[in-house]
Amino acid sequence: MSEDKYSILLPTYNERENLPVITWLLCKYLDEAGIKFEIIVIDDGSPDGTLDIAKQLQGIYGEEKIVLRPRAKKLGLGTAYIHGIKHATGNYVIIMDADLSHHPKFIPEMIVKQKEGNYDLVSGTRYSGSGGVFGWDLKRKIISRGANYVTQILLRPGASDLTGSFRLYRKDVLQKLVESCVSKGYVFQMEMVVRARQFGYTIGEVPISFVDRVYGESKLGGSEIIGFVKGLVYLFATT
């Protein structure tokens, strides 16, 4: 498609079943589209042997495609991105989950969208156009929709999906946003979009289908929901 290179940051924790599948899908769809890329696996000391699987994948696909940058323990999503950016050789960075909830088939669409509008950030959205969520029960859908609706009213971010974590950034833009954010956990993704608006960065959107994880347990719990509410109040008061 171009001489651009895309560094895909994959923070992992207990994803030994999912990592081989997401890696295969990434290589399939990006190679078919002629996209130059690398996958940077940032494993935070997974006790299930995720890193061992990542090493096997590196042996299969090569060190240029699979870059391993593990850490000793869980240190948070924001610091995982900072760690990954330091090792990224692409001029664009893609962030996504390793649990198969984000399908790599949407990445070429995100790249095309970025080129069309010369956007600083392109976000995959579940809440616009043909986007949607599959595999969630009604309660979780209501919580997610409700949180997004309240956030839209309070923060007016200029994007339809604030809590999603499937995005394409210019590398320098992601670096500045990550360094400016103070939130932890799920609020971090929301703050990234709010700060992007604050700094005057342009945001494009591509509708995506979000699928609940197939293997492993969801990391969303009561403490994350409380943290989300606190983070929303903080951002409303400070932006």
Predicted region positions:
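Acidic helix N-cap motif at the loop->helix transition within catalytic regions
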Residues: 17-21, 48-57
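Conserved sequence signature across two-component system core domains
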Residues: 12, 42-44, 71
